[in-house]
Curated annotation (Swiss-Prot):
Organism: Methanoculleus marisnigri (strain ATCC 35101 / DSM 1498 / JR1)
Modified residues (Hypusine): K35
GO cellular component: cytoplasm
Keyword Protein biosynthesis on entry: yes
GO biological process, one term: positive regulation of translational termination
Sections of the chain in a coiled coil: none
The protein's name: Translation initiation factor 5A
Pfam families, per the entry: IF5A-like_N
Single GO MF annotation: RNA binding
Function: Functions by promoting the formation of the first peptide bond.
Protein biosynthesis among keywords: yes
PANTHER family on file: TRANSLATION INITIATION FACTOR 5A FAMILY MEMBER
Gene name tied to this protein: eIF5A
Keywords on record: Cytoplasm, Hypusine, Initiation factor, Protein biosynthesis
Length: 125
Protein backbone atom coordinates (compact mmCIF):
# COMPACT_ATOMS: atom_id res chain seq x y z
CA UNK A 1 0.00 0.00 0.00
CA UNK A 2 1.09 3.54 -0.62
CA UNK A 3 -0.21 7.06 -0.11
CA UNK A 4 0.38 10.40 -1.83
CA UNK A 5 2.23 13.36 -0.36
CA UNK A 6 4.00 16.49 -1.62
CA UNK A 7 7.72 16.32 -2.38
CA UNK A 8 8.33 19.37 -0.14
CA UNK A 9 7.07 17.46 2.92
CA UNK A 10 9.55 14.57 2.57
CA UNK A 11 12.44 14.31 5.04
CA UNK A 12 15.66 12.31 5.33
CA UNK A 13 15.19 8.86 6.83
CA UNK A 14 11.60 8.58 5.57
CA UNK A 15 10.45 6.44 2.64
CA UNK A 16 9.45 7.21 -0.97
CA UNK A 17 8.47 5.09 -3.99
CA UNK A 18 10.92 5.43 -6.91
CA UNK A 19 10.53 3.22 -10.01
CA UNK A 20 7.89 1.11 -8.17
CA UNK A 21 10.43 0.26 -5.45
CA UNK A 22 10.17 1.46 -1.82
CA UNK A 23 13.31 3.45 -0.93
CA UNK A 24 14.73 5.11 2.20
CA UNK A 25 15.67 8.77 1.66
CA UNK A 26 19.39 9.46 2.20
CA UNK A 27 19.54 13.15 1.25
CA UNK A 28 17.35 15.95 -0.05
CA UNK A 29 18.65 19.08 -1.78
CA UNK A 30 16.23 21.90 -2.64
CA UNK A 31 17.07 24.59 -5.20
CA UNK A 32 15.74 28.13 -5.00
CA UNK A 33 12.98 29.14 -7.41
CA UNK A 34 14.14 31.04 -10.46
CA UNK A 35 12.57 33.96 -12.26
CA UNK A 36 10.14 31.75 -14.19
CA UNK A 37 10.38 28.40 -12.46
CA UNK A 38 9.43 26.70 -9.25
CA UNK A 39 11.76 25.31 -6.59
CA UNK A 40 12.96 21.77 -7.28
CA UNK A 41 14.07 18.99 -4.96
CA UNK A 42 16.71 16.37 -5.69
CA UNK A 43 16.07 13.24 -3.63
CA UNK A 44 18.78 10.57 -3.27
CA UNK A 45 17.54 7.27 -1.87
CA UNK A 46 18.43 3.59 -1.49
CA UNK A 47 16.03 0.71 -2.21
CA UNK A 48 14.87 -1.17 0.88
CA UNK A 49 14.78 -4.58 -0.79
CA UNK A 50 17.42 -4.37 -3.55
CA UNK A 51 19.92 -1.84 -2.11
CA UNK A 52 20.13 0.09 -5.41
CA UNK A 53 20.85 3.84 -5.18
CA UNK A 54 18.27 5.97 -7.00
CA UNK A 55 17.67 9.70 -7.37
CA UNK A 56 14.78 11.81 -8.62
CA UNK A 57 14.34 15.52 -9.33
CA UNK A 58 10.83 16.93 -8.98
CA UNK A 59 9.18 20.29 -8.24
CA UNK A 60 8.57 20.85 -4.51
CA UNK A 61 4.81 21.14 -5.11
CA UNK A 62 4.59 17.84 -7.09
CA UNK A 63 2.87 14.81 -5.59
CA UNK A 64 4.74 11.55 -5.05
CA UNK A 65 3.96 8.21 -3.44
CA UNK A 66 5.11 7.18 0.03
CA UNK A 67 5.05 3.43 0.80
CA UNK A 68 3.52 2.10 3.99
CA UNK A 69 6.35 0.08 5.55
CA UNK A 70 5.25 -2.39 8.21
CA UNK A 71 7.53 -4.06 10.72
CA UNK A 72 6.15 -7.42 11.86
CA UNK A 73 7.20 -10.56 13.70
CA UNK A 74 7.31 -14.05 12.19
CA UNK A 75 8.11 -17.52 13.51
CA UNK A 76 10.62 -19.70 11.66
CA UNK A 77 8.89 -22.92 10.54
CA UNK A 78 11.65 -24.60 8.52
CA UNK A 79 15.01 -23.89 6.90
CA UNK A 80 16.08 -25.48 3.59
CA UNK A 81 19.43 -24.16 2.35
CA UNK A 82 19.00 -20.40 1.99
CA UNK A 83 15.19 -20.57 1.84
CA UNK A 84 13.36 -19.96 5.11
CA UNK A 85 9.67 -20.73 5.62
CA UNK A 86 8.03 -18.26 8.01
CA UNK A 87 4.62 -17.77 9.62
CA UNK A 88 3.36 -14.32 10.61
CA UNK A 89 2.64 -14.23 14.36
CA UNK A 90 -0.54 -12.11 14.10
CA UNK A 91 -2.43 -13.35 11.03
CA UNK A 92 -0.72 -16.79 10.67
CA UNK A 93 0.17 -16.10 7.01
CA UNK A 94 2.79 -18.55 5.67
CA UNK A 95 5.52 -17.34 3.28
CA UNK A 96 9.05 -18.15 2.14
CA UNK A 97 12.05 -15.83 1.92
CA UNK A 98 15.46 -16.30 0.34
CA UNK A 99 18.14 -15.16 2.79
CA UNK A 100 21.94 -15.02 2.91
CA UNK A 101 24.19 -17.65 4.51
CA UNK A 102 24.96 -15.27 7.41
CA UNK A 103 21.25 -14.79 8.16
CA UNK A 104 20.58 -18.56 8.04
CA UNK A 105 23.31 -19.14 10.67
CA UNK A 106 21.36 -17.14 13.28
CA UNK A 107 18.02 -18.86 12.63
CA UNK A 108 16.47 -21.98 14.08
CA UNK A 109 12.95 -23.46 13.84
CA UNK A 110 10.56 -22.01 16.42
CA UNK A 111 12.48 -18.73 16.81
CA UNK A 112 10.58 -15.43 16.32
CA UNK A 113 12.27 -12.85 14.10
CA UNK A 114 11.33 -9.35 12.83
CA UNK A 115 10.72 -8.67 9.14
CA UNK A 116 9.76 -5.72 6.91
CA UNK A 117 6.78 -5.74 4.54
CA UNK A 118 5.98 -3.10 1.90
CA UNK A 119 4.30 -3.08 -1.53
CA UNK A 120 3.91 -6.87 -1.49
CA UNK A 121 7.60 -7.56 -0.79
CA UNK A 122 9.14 -8.93 2.40
CA UNK A 123 12.64 -8.95 3.90
CA UNK A 124 14.28 -9.94 7.18
CA UNK A 125 15.52 -7.01 9.26
Amino acid sequence: MKEQTEVGKLKEGRYVVVEDEPCRIVSIATSKPGKHGAAKSRIDCIGIFDGVKRSIVQPVSAKTYVPIVERKMAQVISIAGTTVQLMDVKDFDMFELNVTEEQVAGLEPGKEIPYISSLGKKKLE
